Amino acid sequence: MGNVRVIDVHQSVYAVNDEIAAKTRARLKEEKTFMVNLMSSPGAGKTTTLIRTANMLGDRYRIGVMEADIDSSVDAEKMAAAGVTSIQVHTGGECAMDAHMTMQALDEFDTEGLDLLVMENVGNLVCPAETDTGASRNVVILSYPEGCLLYTSPSPRDRQKSRMPSSA
């Protein structure tokens, strides 16, 4: 019977992506640009939410949008029609942006003049959630077709009560 030899390299398959994401965060921090990775299923309201947000906050903050899509430019055209500074990133069949694509897009976008940059990721909830893009925050919009997600964090008082022995 043959021997099995295991070689454990202890390196994440995301190691290169994570390194680029860290560089992206450092670059944006230096430029004083806060980047949000906005995710949802198709039709959940990402574009509409971004246009309304830009209209509400545009007088106080310089806002830009990075539109990610497999092949379409529809959302970037909507942003432009609404007067929102944006660029279109075609992911070439990839189901979500990764750190390398984000960095390439940033090289084409004048982020130094922005306070807030929102990446409208590809309409998909499977791929983008686990991929680090270099964004400061990840935000998910859930709509009724996905069902209702309710997360409540217990208050400190409730947590304290749960540590008390039961009287039964």
Where do the model's predicted regions map?
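Short, well-ordered beta-strand core segments
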Residues: S86, L117, N138-V139, S153, ...
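Short glycine-rich anion-binding loops that position phosphate/pyrophosphate groups of nucleotides
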Residues: S41, V122-L125, Y144-G147
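Hydrophobic alpha-helical segments, chiefly the membrane-spanning helices
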Residues: M164-A168
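Nucleotide-state-sensitive switch-loop elements of NTP-binding domains
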Residues: V4, H10-E19, T33, T53-A129
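Conserved small/polar residues in nucleotide/adenosyl-binding loops
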Residues: Y151-D158
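Walker A (P-loop) phosphate-binding motif
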Residues: R25-G58, I63
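Conserved beta-strand segments of the P-loop GTPase G domain that flank and frequently precede/overlap
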Residues: L38, V89-H90, V140-Y144, R163
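Conserved Switch II/interswitch segment of TRAFAC-class P-loop GTPases
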Residues: A135-L150
